[in-house]
Amino acid sequence: PRGYPLLYVGQGINQVSGEAVRLGYHIFSLIDGKELYFINGRDKFAYIGWGAFDGNPLIDSKNDTMILPGENGLVYVTKLNTNYDTVNGNITIKPNVTRYRYTKNGYAGGMENSIAIYNNSAFFINNNGILQALDLNTLSPLWSYNMEDDCDATLGLEEENNTIMLYAACEVDKRGTVAPAFAKKIDGKTGQVIWEYSCICQYDANVNGGALSSPIIGKNDISNLVIFNFSKTTNLRTGKMVALDKANGNVVWKKDLSFYSWSSPVACYTKEGKSY
């Protein structure tokens, strides 16, 4: 972002070629490849001992700040204090880190999705299924909602009628071998559920069924649609792509997949606004 030669990299595991390595988040200079900063995921401030970072951060270019959720249950708000010397080809950072932690009914949860932000409000879901809205000015919670299961998929976010709408979906992980995976539209200002859609999916200990990826929030000729991918539907191999009406959650079309997909679908548009 901003044209700065910085690379932001999170780890999902703590082993390389079978050998244990430190686990956390890295910032590298793309000028010389040197590591400029490391966040130790095994943070003593965290309620959770696992220190992976599966999601991407959001870089606030105006305020030179990185906002990053971790699987240790912390949200890191880091003022980078970047100094980029374009004449001599040097870049440095002096991070100042603030951390937010929380529990819900006595339980902590880690975040495996990327953070979604609108103005001063951040939105994320933990692996207990707790969707939370966070005030970034005060680092205090605004509201929370239980999605009923683990959520790896990053939220979709869209402005609508002077409010913020969130599109969220969960997996089938903690509720038995066969259960509904939910896709929901939620008012980002209040946490109120507008509608929900369910798709029966299978549990698999290796790769969970359900929604593991972000939806398409349609534009142009599909501006009325939000499109989700569900994995492991009728069995452990199959999947389903479903287009839902943004207004009411009704199915507009669906496509059964012979093999499931847990990547995010992508919409492409012509200059005339035709979608593919």
Question: Language-model features: where?
Answer:
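Internal alpha-helical scaffold/solenoid segments in large eukaryotic proteins
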Residues: 12, 53-55, 124-132, 136, ...
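Beta-propeller-forming repeat regions
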Residues: 29, 116, 121-123, 187-188, ...
